[in-house]
Structure formats: structure tokens, C-alpha cells
Amino acid sequence: KLRAYTYNLQNGKVVETKLSDDAIFKEKKSKNTVIKKFTMPAVQPGCIIEYSYTINSDFLFNLQPWNFQGSYPRLWSEYEVEMPSFFEYVSFSQGYRKFDIEDKKTSSQMFRIRIPGNNSWEKDETITMTDDVNQYRWIMKNVPPLKEEKYTSSLDDYVSRIAFQLSAYNFKDQPKKPVMGNWFTAAEDLMNDES
């Protein structure tokens, strides 16, 4: 879902122009990725643009990061994510700014999950379960642009952002299964490596 608006001040009044469907272009990047590109309507110097979009993804290891800051100022930068509680993620925030708003809500939802068999002769199993869904929301207001400064090697290291990494599966009635390593597991893997 993609929505976008351009706001211009004309004769002392704010004029809102909505993004039309014919200004949205789809590009199939790969078997699993579709990119939507769009051209903002009525863009003029001094205008304000607003856009929002939703990403639905089955790729658990690729929970999208969000940059709250960029090369242009942002009046309001918001990121919302919903994830089932049986997928545990760690979040990493970066940058010098703190969140103006940080919310978490929990609701219940029913899921159908396919569990692959352990070997070639064991069939996949589908289970139905009800579990919590965690809804997170982070907001930064009046975010200044990030500008290149002398002696700065990479602006990417300073941009205000949030990113995620899957750390464990935690299904009800099953043992927790960590997927993110730590220094102890890394050392153990190195010691057990035959090469």
C-alpha cells in the first residue's frame, strides 16, 4: 500500500495534490522482490511531500531498517512494525537523536505455520496457533538534514535509524531456538572448525 501527497502554498492557501495510480510504476527486481517507484505530483520549490507505504514480507531475517534522517529535513518520520511474539528480534538504534515517541502494543492473532520435516522421509507439518503480535512505533519530529562535514568518513555511520536482527524462535510448548550467535558460540565454532 502506497500513499503520497504534495502540499503547496498558493495565494495564501494550502493546496493538497494526491499521488495518482498512473504515477506509480512497478518493477520486478527478482522472484521475491517487487519495487514500486513513483513520481510526486506538483513538486515545486518550498513544497512539503508526505508519503507512507506498507511492506508485507515473509523474509524473517530481513526485517526492513528505517532511516529517520536523510539529506532533506523531515517534519515527521515514523516507523511502525508488527511481528509475532514467537519471533524475537533485537533492535539497534543509531544516531544522536532520541525518539520523540516510542510505543509498544500487544494483541492476539491466529497463525498457520508450516514446520518442515527433519529429513527427506518426514512430512512437513502445519500447525494452527494463537499468539501475541507486538506492534511497535517509533517517531522522530523535526529531524534536521544530515550534511557532510569535514573529516567525516561515512555519513551512514551517523544517520538516525533503527535496524533489527532475528535472535530466536520461541514457539509455545517448544524450546527456544536461538539463531543469533554470540562470542561464546563464535569461539566454539572456530575451535570445532577442522580447517
Give the location of each predicted region.
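Solvent-exposed beta-hairpin/edge-strand motifs
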Residues: 1-18, 76-92
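Short, mixed-charge, low-aromatic patches
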Residues: 5-9, 34-38, 156-165
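Non-catalytic accessory/assembly modules
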Residues: 9, 37-47, 51, 67, ...
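A glycine-rich, hydrophobic loop/mini-helix early in the fold
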Residues: 14, 23-24
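Edge strands and adjacent loops of beta-rich recognition modules
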Residues: 24-34, 59
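Short amphipathic beta-strand and strand-loop transition segments with alternating hydrophobic
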Residues: 26, 39, 125-127
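Secretory-pathway-linked proteins and extracytosolic
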Residues: 44, 56-61, 65, 69-195
